[in-house]
Swiss-Prot record:
Lineage: Bacteria, Pseudomonadati, Pseudomonadota, Gammaproteobacteria, Pseudomonadales
Organism (species): Pseudomonas fluorescens (strain SBW25)
EC number: 1.2.1.71
Protein name: N-succinylglutamate 5-semialdehyde dehydrogenase
Taxonomy, superkingdom: Bacteria
Keyword NAD: yes
EC class of the enzyme, as a word: oxidoreductase
NCBIfam families in the record: arg_catab_astD, PRK09457.1
Keywords: Arginine metabolism, NAD, Oxidoreductase
Primary role: Catalyzes the NAD-dependent reduction of succinylglutamate semialdehyde into succinylglutamate.
GO biological process: arginine catabolic process to glutamate; arginine catabolic process to succinate
InterPro entries for this protein: Ald_DH/histidinol_DH, Ald_DH_C, Ald_DH_CS_CYS, Ald_DH_CS_GLU, Ald_DH_N, Aldehyde_DH_dom, SuccinylGlu_semiald_DH_AstD
Pathway: Amino-acid degradation; L-arginine degradation via AST pathway; L-glutamate and succinate from L-arginine: step 4/5
Length: 488
């Protein structure tokens, strides 16, 4: 199978054979070979050769290609949504919104690029001071599996807009979505070599990240892989490295008046996308006492009724599957370990079918566990921690190496202002689901959640660098010479 797209041609990979499966039926959706280090080098050379012509194209011409890509996404929206749903397991209603986000990213990127870059000039003595921006050259984009269309698109679009050429390495769990996305770029008229697709797993990723021919790398994925990349790029200030990683995100609940509103927001924060969003709530901080007991009882009762099913099931489920049987097993094992260490199951997560990666929501009280692991459990497993007072809640919220998202459900604006000020996170929400963020806002965290904000409004800052110039059309001897210099 021709699994790679290099220099405008579809080629068979020469590396390890791998496949993607529908996580519910286990039906094979895609199979092919990954790219070898030699094929990665060929793709880097193709991107390097394509770079000058693409960078010299007028901005409006590049924008035209991007807008045609957006139109192609809209024309093929049903096909793309179904592809995302069957490969990730997320319900169709959610896949449809992902395709919409992909198309909307074009206008957002164009607006931010115009505002953050462009050309500025002013007089400076007998010359003109000019500030312009230039693309970096060849950049790599590593995509995740949870939003295999939208998230890599958030880096590919601004990179191409700025005049860079791109090497796209998608998750090995979602190769079919990546292939379809590249087909849409081809249909939009993107020139050969400007975007190259490198399918593959760990070996392909290592070869691409280590290739000296790339000028930068944009990564979205696990903290473990991101940390490896950071170590690999250590001592390389000539390379751009932007990392968007995970989080052990806290959602603090105050004693609010509308309990059902709190319950609904918690469910949207913890269990949407089967808990496979990097901003999902992992830790639910609930006050001690009768009010907290009542909230948890209501949360458990409602969560137990959440519909879980296949991506195309009708009526549509709220939750689809996790990405794979291996992911499901890891989550079940994590729950078992928590319970063995003294946690209490308020609602035990289950796997109804052994050969389907469908999991029901789990709510585990870990308040009494003395040695809690500070890790991102990427699935529908919510840990409850009871707190004595608001100061203790904030301290517990910050008790993590991560710092991606944090949220507060409270009727008190003063408490939110305190929470916002003292929280260590890149996204802080008040009375809204933790997974909600404006698509125009820069996305990212602090600590082990990553570095930089190479997306949305700030994307242009990482795709083009400023060049300062002093310019004058004529070379003349100044009226006054510097002391100690004579021309006669």
């Amino acid at each position: 199978m021709n699994s790679l797209y290099i220099a405008g041609s579809w080629l068979a990979g020469q590396g390890e054979l791998f496949e993607s499966r529908n996580p519910v039926t286990q039906h094979v959706l895609w199979a092919g070979n990954g790219a070898t280090a030699e094929q990665v080098e060929s793709a880097v050379q193709a991107a390097r050769q394509a770079f000058p012509a693409w960078a010299r194209r007028p901005l409006e011409e590049r924008i035209s290609v991007l807008e045609t890509f957006a139109a192609t996404l809209k024309n093929r929206a049903d096909e793309i949504a179904r592809c995302i749903g069957e490969e990730t397991g997320k319900p169709l209603w959610e896949s449809v919104t992902e395709v919409t986000s992909m198309a909307n990213k074009i206008a957002i990127s164009v607006q931010s690029y115009r505002e953050r870059t462009g050309e500025k000039s002013g007089p400076l003595g007998d010359a003109t001071a000019v500030l312009r921006h230039k693309p970096h050259g060849v950049v790599a984009v590593f995509g995740p599996y949870n939003f295999p269309g939208h998230l890599p698109n958030g880096h590919i679009v601004p990179a191409l807009l700025a005049g860079n050429t791109v090497l796209f390495k998608p998750s090995e769990l979602t190769p079919k979505v990546a292939e379809l996305t590249v087909q849409c770029w081809i249909e939009a008229g993107l020139p050969a070599g400007v975007l190259n697709l490198l399918q593959g797993a760990r070996e392909t990723g290592i070869a691409l990240a280590a290739n000296p021919g790339i000028d930068g790398l944009f990564f979205t994925g696990s903290s473990r892989t991101g940390n490896h990349l950071h170590q690999q790029f250590s001592g390389r200030p000539d390379k751009i490295l932007a990392l968007e990683m995970g989080g052990n995100n806290p959602l603090v609940v105050d004693e609010v008046a509308d309990v059902d509103a709190a319950v609904y927001t918690i469910i949207q924060s913890a269990f949407i996308s089967a808990g496979q969003r990097c901003t999902c709530a992992r830790r639910l901080l609930v006050p001690e006492g009768a009010w907290g007991d009542a909230l948890l009882a209501r949360l458990v009762a409602v969560s137990a009724t959440i519909a879980v099913g296949a991506f195309d099931q009708q009526p549509a489920p709220f939750m689809g599957s996790v990405i794979s049987l291996a992911a499901a097993k890891a989550l079940m094992d994590a729950q078992e370990l928590m319970l063995a260490n003294g946690a209490v199951a308020l609602l035990e997560m289950t796997q109804p079918q052994d050969q389907a990666a469908l999991l029901t929501p789990g709510i585990i009280d870990v308040t009494g566990v003395t040695a809690r692991e500070d890790e991102e459990l990427f699935g529908p497993l919510l840990q409850v921690i009871r707190y004595a007072d608001f100061a203790a809640a904030i301290a517990e919220a910050n008790n993590t190496q991560y710092g991606l998202a944090a949220g507060l459900l409270s009727d008190s604006e003063a408490r939110y202002q305190q929470f916002w000020l003292e929280s260590r996170a890149g996204i802080v929400n008040w009375n809204k689901q933790l997974t909600g963020a404006a698509s125009t806002a820069p996305f990212g965290g602090v600590g082990a959640s990553g570095n930089h904000r190479a997306s949305a409004y700030y994307a242009a800052d990482y795709c083009a660098y400023p060049v300062a110039s002093l310019e004058t059309p004529s070379l003349v001897v100044p009226a006054t010479l510097t002391p100690g210099v004579r021309l006669s």
